[in-house]
Amino acid sequence: MAGNSQRRGAVRKPGTKKGPTVGSGGVRRRGLEGKGATPPAEQRTKHPAAKRAAVQRKIADAKQRRLKQGDEAEMVLGRNPVLECLRTGVPATALYVAVGADNDERLTESVALAADAGIAILEVPRPDLDRMSTNGLHQGLALQIPPYKYAHPDDLLARARAEAQPALLVALDNISDPRNLGAIVRSVAAFGGHGVVIPQRRSASVTAVAWRTSAGAAARLPVARATNLTRTLKDWQDKGITIVGLDAGGDTELDNLDGVGDIAVVVGSEGKGLSQLVRKTCDAVVSIPMAGPVESLNASVAAGVVLAEIARQRR
């Protein structure tokens, strides 16, 4: 007979497949059927993989918080930003160059400056550089900046005491722009200040942008972080430091400020000004008299004006 109809096993013997139980309507059998696709192990709360995934999420969240606080290495991307960092002496640990990157004057100078500074120069495949820069626009060049090593607020006062000079300190309140931070650091260094203190939270950090704006002053002037800025200011008051706030609505004009003694200038943001607690802590709040219709100055410009006046009085 044609075909495989006579092959042993080709025809199921009667009674080999049990149907639904008579009288049950197949309910008990259907109850054993699956309830859909099994979710991934990471989504099953009691599975070890889910616990591991939860731990990894916590680690990632913590890392993200540290990144926001400037406690992690930073990647500067692009040929112009990288070259500017190297020209201004921003400390770096590695210069990454993509394999096959188009050579131009910026790339050549960046490699030369990195070599002169003893910075490691690493040639990496472009996909690796894409991954390292989280697919940012790197133009085949990236510079790794180590996290800034902040001083303690007490170190700033100790530095002033060691130089046997009246202390000149600057505290920043609500300053979120790293360019303002860098410009203020530059002014403090230019006018003989002993350091800058910033809050640990809700403040700009010493990033590559701040480094570049400071024109290298961040390498010479210590920047400290205060867990609680108000508490730090009160501690300085107890040690004989006059706390002077800088605000457009201040009750004392800059012309009447006595800047000869130990002083700490607190600079608020152009928009928010000084926070309420910091303002209450100040011994005086100074304003800068202006002849024109401008109501306020940029925070870094205002800080420079006050520091220049204090330096003039001390000469």
UniProtKB/Swiss-Prot annotation:
Its EC number is 2.1.1.-. This is Uncharacterized tRNA/rRNA methyltransferase MAB_0572. Residues 1-53 are annotated as: Disordered. SMART domains: SpoU_sub_bind (SM00967). Keywords: Methyltransferase, S-adenosyl-L-methionine, Transferase. S-adenosyl-L-methionine binds at residues 268, 288, 297. The keyword S-adenosyl-L-methionine applies. One of its GO terms (biological process) is methylation. Belongs to the class IV-like SAM-binding methyltransferase superfamily. RNA methyltransferase TrmH family. One of its GO terms (cellular component) is cytosol. InterPro entries: Alpha/beta_knot_MTases, Ribosomal_eL30-like_sf, rRNA_MeTrfase_TrmH, SpoU_MeTrfase, SpoU_subst-bd, tRNA_m1G_MTases_N. It comes from the Bacteria. It is an enzyme of class 2 (transferase).
